[in-house]
Structures are given as structure tokens and as C-alpha cells.
Amino acid sequence: MTDVPAVRIRNFCIIAHIDHGKSTLADRLLQATGTVEDRKMKEQFLDNMDLERERGITIKLQAARMNYTAKDGQQYVLNLIDTPGHVDFSYEVSRSLVACEGALLVVDASQGVEAQTLANVYLALENNLEIIPVLNKIDLPGAEPERVIGEIEEIIGLDCSGAILASAKEGLGIDEILEAVVERIPPPPNTINERLRALIFDSYYDSYRGVIVYFRVMDGTVRKGDRIHLMASGKEFEIDELGVLSPTQKQVEELHAGEVGYLGAAIRAVADARVGDTITLSKAKAESPLPGYAEANPMVYCGMFPIDADQFEDLREALEKLELNDAALHYEPETSSAMGFGFRCGFLGLLHMEIVQERLEREYNLDLIITAPSVVYKVITLKGEELYIDNPSRLPSPNDRQRIEEPYVQVEMITPETYVGSLMELSQNRRGIFKDMKYLAQGRTTLTYELPLAEVVTDFFDQMKSRSRGYASMEYHLIGYRENPLVKLDIMINGDPVDSLAMIVHRDKAYNVGRAMAEKLKELIPRHQFKVPIQASIGSKVIASEHIPALRKDVLAKCYGGDISRKKKLLQKQAKGKKRMKSVGTVDVPQEAFMAVLRLDQS
């Protein structure tokens, strides 16, 4: 099965925006090459997770090996490495691009180029990939291939003279795509005689076989039974299973330079086989690891606490298992006076956070309280030390710090002209700095803003979608830290600060956010037997407060007429009881209150 020379191997991926038909195209390629029999075919064959099929997005990376007989009569091996299209998963895209020599750029012929497609195309160009433009969905009545070709040439600067018109749904243009892959994408370099180097681009945990590693052999040959050395973690293992993905796993004896496959080596901890690590042989180690991989750094943090304290260990186990499949998920234990024991988790972005939360609840049956997301701030202390703070409650006091810096991102939005004004207003309200605006063909515009990440992670995406009636798309990337007058806003309920509600805000916005927060909590916290004050404060200065009135029992109900002093005595007794209750009573804060921060109307 592996006797195809490197000259006849093609490694490629598909770059596309959500909903532009990437998974359907992958399905058609699998069918056309006979890799998957028609009777076993189901939609979105490579999207394994239920969540992926439901949301119609690709989250985890998949790979498939196809045998294809081209028009020149030669037998070729095509390795398709499927990539996610969402901005949060750009690290997954970057590692699949490193394993390829070419890419199919799939663009919806009725919608045109979207912002996230751009980001991935730039990544592909940086990795010197050969890009083949494919216009999908040409069977739709609204398809305008000429306009879209113009857009690709104008925005990306790609030559589209060889663009392929296709409809994955109808099966049009599939043969042309396969021929183009063979003719235009270069074969992998023939480095079979060099020392083994292979790139890990994905791994997942199998409860029977341990960690299964997906990899691309860059140099040399790997055989079943080899003892391998992982260059970043320094661990060594013996390969007991080696195979290719077509798309189900098929075992083979050896894989050569240019091939894509999987291995099992009784690896127990995912941390030992990190994505992006280089595999080499223990007895003949490569001199240097493969370049171009960076650790995925979380940009957004939040607290996760089990509603039932007994589930803490279950949550720990669930996170450990998820981390196995998700190189970018970070977590550490944390305690909160309001919520008890839980974890502080780091994510790549909001969609990533939602998906992890949904998987914990769905696959592991956990009931969770999630605190509002926050970003990583850089604090310069008086001694000149740099601290990175991902939890507002850990911020040093104003007397111990010189300044606070927050992460900024460059946001690119592509939108129909009609909504430009509304999106500019949204960006200005979120402390955005206008950078650029370009008019594209057919009444579409690109807007470029620099925004604090903290303003983007709450509900910027939802607001952008609602203001543009779903037509705008956005992409963002980190551009560094900048100093701003930021303050820590504490929320106190019944005189006690609630650490999970603390947040870092811009000084100019502090009053409005504090006011809105106090009002929202007043609505959400149920009434108690005693009066509950809610205060928003900066340091010791209270900037907004609300009161939840007490529930009162009518202690005078049994006094008909009679002496006023009797009534006073009963009222004083009640007041004394309330006072005592207030000092020892705890306030029950419902889960909705912790998510209220997300829904404050700031726009």
C-alpha cells in the first residue's frame, strides 16, 4: 500500500469559510476516488463529533488518504488534511498547513470572499503552498462566478485564470479538481534517505490504545516496532501500531517521506505527544526539530465551577480527557469564596469556550457555572516586574503597580456597504481605532479597526452579526499590548466582595458598567428575609449601589387595637432578628447573575 514513490504523492488541504461547502466537497472527493463506498457515505464524513455536524462546522482536524488513477494512467496517493474554518481554530489550520504542499481555496460563488478565508489564505501563502481557487455552489441561482473571481484577484492577489467552477452538492467539477491537485500541487521532496523527522498535526485519546498520533513524515522512513523519540517532550516510545487513514484506520508496516498516517505507541498522557512536536528515531536522532510551530496561547479565560460540589473530581477528569484532544485548552484549579472549588480555563476565543462548555455538559453530564470571560492583562509593578493576570481578583493593588496594559487585536470585517455606518459606530463604542476602509466589487467593503481584546470577547461578534443582519464576517489577530487607564471594578453583595464578578474596565466606562451591573443583579438575585445591598466599587469608593428589599412577615397581624407599646415591642424584636440575620445570613446568588456580565448592554 505504501509502494507509491514520493513523486506521486500529493498532500493538500481545503481552505474555506464556514458554510462555503468544504465538508461536502471533501465528501465528494472521497466518493469520486472510491475511498468511501457510496452505501457507507454519510454527510460530512470527516466531521466525527456530533457537535460538528450539528453546528455545521469543522472543529477537530481529520485526514484521509485517497488512491486516484489520473488521466495519465498513473496511480497517485492524495492525502487530504481537513481544516477548520473558524477564526478560533486558526492554530489547527496552521499545523495542517505545515503538513501540506498545496491548498484548495473554496469560495461560495454566490457570497464571495469572507474575512476568515483571508486569514487562512495568508497563512497558506506564508507556508509557500500552491493555491488552487475553486468556486463552489455554481448551481445556485444567485451565483456570480465572474464577480467572485474579480474579488479573489483584487483582495488576495491570486491569479484566477485557472479557477475551477464546481458544485460539490451536484458533483460538478470534481474530476477537474482531482486532476488539478495532481497537475498543479508539487510532490513532497524526496528525502527518504535522511534521518526520520515527522510532524504531529493531531492526536486523540483512545481508552483502549492510549494516545493515537496523526503525523506527516517529512524526512526518512518510520516502521512498526521502531523506538521513537519526541523532540519537544523528550519522551521515548515503541510503535506498536502504524497505519494510514483512508479515512478509517488501516494498518501498514512502514511509511516514507511525504506520507501521512497515524501511530499508536502506548502513550498514556497527551502532554507527551504535543501537537507540533517532531518525531525522530531514538537510535538515529535528527539534528534539529521541524520549524514553524508555536504553542497555542489562550486569549480568553473564564472560571468553571460545578453546581454540585461533589462533581469537582468529575470535572477534573473531563478536562483532562478534553485536553487530550485539544492542545489549546489550558486549565488550573481555583477556589472562589462564592462558588467553592473549580477551574480557571483558558481558550483561544469565544467559540472555543462555548464548544468546550457544551462538550463538558453533553459528553460528561456536568452541570456548570461559567463566569464571564476575561483576557490576559500585563501589569508592570513598581519594581519593574511584568505580571500576566488572567483573573481580575488577582490584580495587585494600585499602590504596587506602575501601569496596566491590555491586549489589542486587529479586526477585519467584510460587510455590505449598507451596514458600514452601524459597524463603525459599534467599533467606536468599543474603544476601536479606525485604521482602513476599502471598497470591493459589488457593494462590499472591508473595515479594519484596532480594538482592545476585552471589548471583542464579550458580545462583539453577536452585535456585529445582528447589526449587519448576518451578512458581515470578521477575523481578528493579536497585535500586542497597550497601556490604558484601567481600573478594577469590584461587586459587593451584602458587604462582601464577590470575586467571580470582579472585572477590569476602562476608567471612562466604569460608572456605566457598575450602574448596569448593580441594576442587573437587583433583578436576578431573589429577595431574602433581610435587606441586601449591592454595591459596585473601585478600591474603597462606591460608584453605584442598589438595594433588594427584605421579605417581611407581618408581626402585627395578631394585634387587634390594643397598646402601641406592644406593637413597638414586636417590631423592635423583628428588627433585631433581621439585624442578626443580616450579619450571619448568606446571600444566594443564582447562576444567571454570573453570566449577566456578558449581557450588559454596552453597545
Curated annotation (Swiss-Prot):
Statement: the UniProt record of this protein carries the keyword GTP-binding: yes
One annotated GO biological process: translation
PROSITE patterns: G_TR_1, G_TR_2
Membrane topology: Peripheral membrane protein
Binding positions (GTP): 19-24, 136-139
Primary location: membrane
Molecular function GO terms recorded: GTP binding; GTPase activity; ribosome binding
Protein name: Elongation factor 4
Organism expressing this protein natively: Nostoc punctiforme (strain ATCC 29133 / PCC 73102)
